[in-house]
């Protein structure tokens, strides 16, 4: 491959106590929490809106955020849920502890922006991470490409909220990633209109009526109406009076760190969505006039880099509902390891793991602070999908409420590090836990 040497003088345009890279659910929680503690926080996002997959990615629903007795993403996450309820009374659950929230993307991105600006976070959109300047294991600055050109940001502490662990990996932190044969598939979520909800309810083919949907999928696959034998039909969610969000179909073997793979995944996903549009119109009552009006601007990546941290949260910890002395949160979503290949057998393996890993009412696993601390980089925390864990734990903690929890913990840890003039590893754990409890975090069973 041909190579060039690229040299350019780049202005250090911004300085902050804490720079958060990536405004997905985890990065937003980190930025708002750190700023709420008094730190000067800069949040940089490559897109034109906050929220990542929860908004730009068009993910239509929050995965469970409760253990059946209490809301687990207490603190930042609970504030988001309260504001979602206030804006969407007609679709809000009567009992938030035991129900699901549908995501209205426009409302959610405004809620995120309100929480960020109210806490004093400086937001910069359309700024894409381009390079990292590291000296002796410490990030001195990060370089971004923006409409104004390239610029650098310096900070005492950096937080990686990129989802893919890009900042950490480019800074020299070790990581692991599943092979192309094992990696979970991705989904391009979508927005649909023209649905007759009364007819849909009476038709019997709800997304939660698995047998009815599988029969229809099987018939369509055998008839050649769907190009792939993907029986893992993941979701239809009503997000407005006459619209729904689709978490439908998969693209397999996507490498989130490769622009060619991402591009092919997006192209293939949009083609498959048209297949499913025809399938729904033909086979599902109430969808005769339905149409897709929008698909996500981000491909729904379920698995990419997992940073190797000071501790690797594992499935045995999960199953034992283990608590940790440095626990900074708790969560309980089952191990939702989407099959890496289509087919009936792979679906059955997924269902077996998902059901067997479901925790009981009131149970949850602890999240230690150490999984946010990447090895070999001193002034960096990670949060969201790229935290240090095994694949089964990733399949639980990667969803939106889990990202709020790890983001909140990273933000508080960073703020205390700045205040104490120390590194994230030097933070007093008792003080960290005390401050998290003060803002509503759930730390113990």
Go through the PLM ranges and name each one.
Residues 1-18:
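Extreme N-terminal leader/targeting segments of oxidoreductases
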Residues 7, 33, 39-40, 45-131, ...:
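Conserved N-terminal/central alpha/beta ligand/cofactor-binding core
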Residues 9, 53, 145-146, 150-157, ...:
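Flavin (FAD/FMN)-binding glycine-rich loop and adjacent Rossmann-like elements that form
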Residues 12-16, 26-27, 55, 151:
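Ligand-binding pocket scaffold of soluble enzyme catalytic domains
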Residues 16-17, 37-40, 119-122, 151, ...:
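Loop/turn elements at helix/coil->beta-strand transitions in domains of secreted/extracellular proteins
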Residues 18-42:
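N-terminal Rossmann-like FAD-binding beta1-loop-alpha1 element of flavoenzymes
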Residues 25, 102-107, 267, 426:
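Soluble non-cytosolic domains of exported or imported proteins
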Residues 136-142:
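Short, hydrophobic/aromatic-rich segments at coil-to-beta transitions
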């Amino acid at each position: 491959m041909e190579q060039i040497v690229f040299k350019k003088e780049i202005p250090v345009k911004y300085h902050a106590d804490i720079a958060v890279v990536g405004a997905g659910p985890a990065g937003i929680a980190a930025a708002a929490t750190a700023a709420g503690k008094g730190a000067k926080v800069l949040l940089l996002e490559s897109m034109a809106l906050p929220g990542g997959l929860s908004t730009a990615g068009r993910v239509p629903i929050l995965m469970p955020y409760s253990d059946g007795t209490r809301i687990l993403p207490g603190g930042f996450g609970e504030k988001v849920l309260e504001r979602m309820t206030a804006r969407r009374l007609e679709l809000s659950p009567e009992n938030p502890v035991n129900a699901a929230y549908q995501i209205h993307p426009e409302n959610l991105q405004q809620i995120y922006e309100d929480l960020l600006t109210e806490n004093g976070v400086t937001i910069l959109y359309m700024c894409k991470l381009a390079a990292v300047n590291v000296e002796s294991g410490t990030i001195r600055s990060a370089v971004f490409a923006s409409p104004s050109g390239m610029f650098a940001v310096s900070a005492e502490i950096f937080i990686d909220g990129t989802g893919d662990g890009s900042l950490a990996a480019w800074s020299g932190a070790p990581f692991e990633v599943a092979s192309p044969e094992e990696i979970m598939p991705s989904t391009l979520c979508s927005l649909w209109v023209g649905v007759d909800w009364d007819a849909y309810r009476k038709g019997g083919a709800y997304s939660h009526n698995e047998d009815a949907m599988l029969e229809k999928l099987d018939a369509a696959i055998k008839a050649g109406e769907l190009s792939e034998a993907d029986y893992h039909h993941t979701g239809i969610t009503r997000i407005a009076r006459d619209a729904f969000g689709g978490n439908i179909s998969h693209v397999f073997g996507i490498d989130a760190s490769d622009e060619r793979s991402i591009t092919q995944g997006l192209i293939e996903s949009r083609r498959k969505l048209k297949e499913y549009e025809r399938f729904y119109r033909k086979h599902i009552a109430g969808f005769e006039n339905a149409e897709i009006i929008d698909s996500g601007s981000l491909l729904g990546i379920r698995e990419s880099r997992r940073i190797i941290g000071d501790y690797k949260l594992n499935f045995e910890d999960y199953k034992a509902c283990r608590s940790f002395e440095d626990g900074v949160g708790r969560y309980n979503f089952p191990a939702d390891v989407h099959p890496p290949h289509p087919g009936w057998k792979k679906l059955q393996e997924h269902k077996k793991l998902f059901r067997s890993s479901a925790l009981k009412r009131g149970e949850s696993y602890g999240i230690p602070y150490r999984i946010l601390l990447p090895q070999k980089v001193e002034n960096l925390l990670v949060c969201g999908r790229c935290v240090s864990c095994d694949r089964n734990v990733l399949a639980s903690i990667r969803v939106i409420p889990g990202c709020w929890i790890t983001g909140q913990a990273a933000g508080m840890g960073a703020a205390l590090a700045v205040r104490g003039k120390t590194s994230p590893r030097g933070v007093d754990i008792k003080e960290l836990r005390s401050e998290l409890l003060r803002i509503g975090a759930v730390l113990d069973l």
